[in-house]
Regions:
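Membrane-embedded alpha-helical bundles that constitute the cytochrome b-like, heme-associated redox core
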Residues: 1-210
């Protein structure tokens, strides 16, 4: 059977990259939200009512998941940026040209997409850099280590990491909503093609046995 609707290698690659981004971002975000809901510190019966509560894993387990899945997310994100670098350069050039000429060739949908992608990229960059800083710079035992105070205090970096993450998650949800049709369309083509191919192989095998 001839499959008329084929998925190009570029589209397939982009879909796989986006799927990897989605999964790693989802796990990193959920584990990050865990830390917002269940802050560290306090004592039993003290001001932190959630002290000592364990959900699936202990806090150290959530920290491990958040850290290493986030590194995986950064790696996939950099790959995504490399493969889409031409689009980034061309879009940036169009924006600066539009500002210079005081006119735009983009419609409202395109401008919204560029704005969301800009917030998404900036949030990713700041969140990733602040996260790497918090990972590399030692906190010290019980948080009593010497703070090197690079630009901000460690608390400042933690706040930057938190709110850039919130901005990234918000933009990612909007981005996902904008491109939901593309995600479903490509997924349907990819998996339908695989199902048809498997059926053809099974039919061919049966015919050969007969």
């Amino acid at each position: 059977m001839e499959i008329k609707k084929r998925v190009s290698s570029t589209t397939r690659r982009n879909w796989i990259l986006d799927s990897g981004l989605f999964l790693t971002a989802l796990i990193a975000s959920l584990s990050g939200i865990y830390f917002l809901i269940f802050p560290e510190g306090g004592y039993k019966g003290g001001r932190n009512p959630y002290y000592g509560i364990q959900i699936i894993f202990e806090r150290e387990g959530w920290e491990w998941i958040h850290t290493w899945i986030s590194f995986g997310f950064i790696a996939v994100g950099l790959l995504h940026l490399i493969f889409h670098w031409k689009w980034v350069v061309n879009t940036t050039s169009r924006i600066f040209h539009s500002l210079k000429e005081r006119k735009t060739s983009m419609n409202k949908a395109s401008r919204l997409n560029v704005l969301v992608d800009g917030v998404l990229g900036l949030g990713f960059l700041i969140c990733a850099l602040s996260g790497v800083y918090l990972f590399v710079v030692p906190e010290g035992k019980n948080g009593l280590g010497v703070d090197p105070m690079i630009l901000f205090s460690r608390t400042g970096w933690d706040l930057v990491h938190t709110w850039s993450g919130v901005a990234f998650i918000s933009a990612a949800i909007i981005h996902f909503g904008i491109h939901w049709g593309w995600v479903v369309k490509v997924a349907r083509k990819m998996f339908t093609r695989k199902a048809v191919f498997a059926t053809e192989q099974m039919t061919l095998s049966i015919n050969q046995d007969i």
